[in-house]
């Protein structure tokens, strides 16, 4: 069965003014759609067609060598963006078990946000910043390109796309401003759901 571009759970303009409508349209309809198209082309005729994208990305070493790079890049792009859309909401509310755990581990939500923002800003070139569950504990990691923490056995519960295509139309070269705006649209309810499933 072919992989499909998921619908956004909100309108393209729902995250304004933090993430603009034009960026959302291009990011979802063009960038994410291209990852899906190229992923389907790469796995066509293989047994990967019947597997979930999570299973594929978690087991990249078992992907045939001749398509491994295409699957890593485009499969990662599809998985990362599918998760990213769900982690955003126009109705952000900082609450839940995961928020309590963050405060316990970092001392405060602000201290966590500062470390996450620093690592996201320091990610050289294109990539992602993540909050992951690793052996029951929370950890902030970054990955290059479209790599996903699942490949390293870590479960992502919050992710931020720091590719320039995610913010350049509105924020140009001011990645830290985009990262700061991100906190206004985090879907903590979804983060909490993922945390409780992973811990």
From Swiss-Prot:
Mn(2+) binds at residues 27, 81, 161, 165. Binds 1 Mn(2+) or Fe(3+) ion per subunit. GO terms for molecular function: metal ion binding; superoxide dismutase activity. Fe(3+) binds at residues 27, 81, 161, 165. One of its GO terms (cellular component) is cytoplasm. The keyword Transcription regulation does not apply. Its EC number is 1.15.1.1. Keywords: Iron, Manganese, Metal-binding, Oxidoreductase, Stress response. InterPro entries: Mn/Fe_SOD, Mn/Fe_SOD_BS, Mn/Fe_SOD_C, Mn/Fe_SOD_N, Mn/Fe_SOD_N_sf, SOD_C_sf. Its cofactor is Mn(2+); Fe(3+). Pfam families: Sod_Fe_C, Sod_Fe_N. It catalyses: 2 superoxide + 2 H(+) = H2O2 + O2. Coiled coil: none annotated. PANTHER family: 37S RIBOSOMAL PROTEIN S26, MITOCHONDRIAL, SMALL RIBOSOMAL SUBUNIT PROTEIN MS42. Belongs to the iron/manganese superoxide dismutase family. Destroys superoxide anion radicals which are normally produced within the cells and which are toxic to biological systems. Catalyzes the dismutation of superoxide anion radicals into O2 and H2O2 by successive reduction and oxidation of the transition metal ion at the active site. Homodimer. This is Superoxide dismutase [Mn/Fe]. It comes from Staphylococcus saprophyticus subsp. saprophyticus (strain ATCC 15305 / DSM 20229 / NCIMB 8711 / NCTC 7292 / S-41).
């Amino acid at each position: 069965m072919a992989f499909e571009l998921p619908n956004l759970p909100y309108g393209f303009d729902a995250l304004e003014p933090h993430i603009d409508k034009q960026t959302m349209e291009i990011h979802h309809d063009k960038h994410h759609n291209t990852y899906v198209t190229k992923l389907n082309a790469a796995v066509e005729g293989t047994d990967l067609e019947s597997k979930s994208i999570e299973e594929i990305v978690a087991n990249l070493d078992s992907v045939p060598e001749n398509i491994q790079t295409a699957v890593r890049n485009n499969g990662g792009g599809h998985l990362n963006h599918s998760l990213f859309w769900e982690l955003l909401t126009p109705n952000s509310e900082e609450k839940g078990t995961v928020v309590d755990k963050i405060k316990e581990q970092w001392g405060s939500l602000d201290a966590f946000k500062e470390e996450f923002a620093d690592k996201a800003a320091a990610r050289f070139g294109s990539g992602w910043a993540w909050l992951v569950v690793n052996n029951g504990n929370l950890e902030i990691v970054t990955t290059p390109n479209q790599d996903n923490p699942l490949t390293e056995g870590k479960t992502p519960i919050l992710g931020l796309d720091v590719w320039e295509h995610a913010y350049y139309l509105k924020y140009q070269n001011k990645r830290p401003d985009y990262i700061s705006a991100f906190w206004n649209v985090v879907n903590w309810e979804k983060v909490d759901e993922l945390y409780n499933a992973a811990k």
